[in-house]
């Protein structure tokens, strides 16, 4: 398969690219800072058209993982970057797919499980999950990002491409630089322990 990974130079994208490449797939990672890799890497700015549109045309699947890291302080500038980077990159991918002569069959779009309200009485899923009301919970900004991010995907004019939102939470991997690495460092410094009620 021909697989394109916008924003695929982060931890999750690297894990996917490594696995797809090992299985013999044709992998292209789109990155703001492309570096050496066993697969093809192309530069993109996450916002506008460019040479990268050519690899989207004829791809079997696009997996968009682009977005500024949320591992930061949530001051106004970072909040704006978190929101803008997700919406702009989603729109850019949608424009590339819409312009393709042979659009991909599937567009997998990163999303976030923080769209759901915190609850202990039932599980949240796509069918019955309770969406957190904006401003009602502690995670109002995260919910706003999630809703606007998904709206950008839904509004993309790509009728020949099936669109799927991946409402994922933190992805744990033993690789350096990921959330597991950060949490493990805290535990090693004696700062581990139960998070919240421990019943999450």
What does each model-found stretch correspond to?
Residues 6, 30, 62-66, 107-113, ...:
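SDR active-site strand-loop-helix element
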Residues 15, 19, 96, 152:
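Rossmann-fold NAD(P)-dependent oxidoreductase module
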Residues 25-32:
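Conserved glycine-rich Rossmann-like NAD(P)H-binding loop of the short-chain dehydrogenase/reductase
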Residues 91-137:
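Conserved Rossmann-fold NAD(P)-dependent oxidoreductase catalytic core, especially the SDR/UDP-sugar
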Residues 134-163:
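Active-site Tyr-X1-5-Lys
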């Amino acid at each position: 398969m021909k697989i394109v990974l916008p924003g695929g130079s982060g931890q999750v994208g690297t894990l996917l690219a490594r696995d797809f490449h090992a299985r013999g797939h044709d992998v292209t990672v789109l990155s703001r800072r492309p570096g050496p890799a066993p697969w093809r890497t192309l530069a993109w700015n996450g916002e506008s058209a460019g040479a990268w549109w050519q690899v989207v045309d004829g791809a079997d699947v696009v997996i968009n993982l682009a977005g500024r890291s949320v591992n930061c302080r949530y001051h106004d500038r970072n909040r704006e970057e978190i929101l803008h980077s997700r919406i702009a990159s989603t729109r850019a991918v949608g424009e590339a797919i819409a312009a393709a002569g042979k659009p991909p069959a599937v567009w997998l779009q990163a999303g976030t499980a923080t769209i759901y309200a915190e609850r202990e009485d039932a599980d949240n899923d796509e069918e019955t999950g309770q969406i957190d009301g904006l401003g009602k919970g502690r995670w109002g900004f995260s919910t706003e990002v999630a809703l606007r991010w998904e709206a950008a995907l839904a509004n993309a004019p790509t009728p020949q491409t099936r669109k799927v939102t991946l409402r994922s939470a933190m992805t744990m991997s033993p690789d350096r630089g990921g959330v597991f690495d950060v949490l493990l460092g805290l535990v090693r410094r004696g700062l581990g322990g139960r998070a919240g009620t421990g019943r999450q």
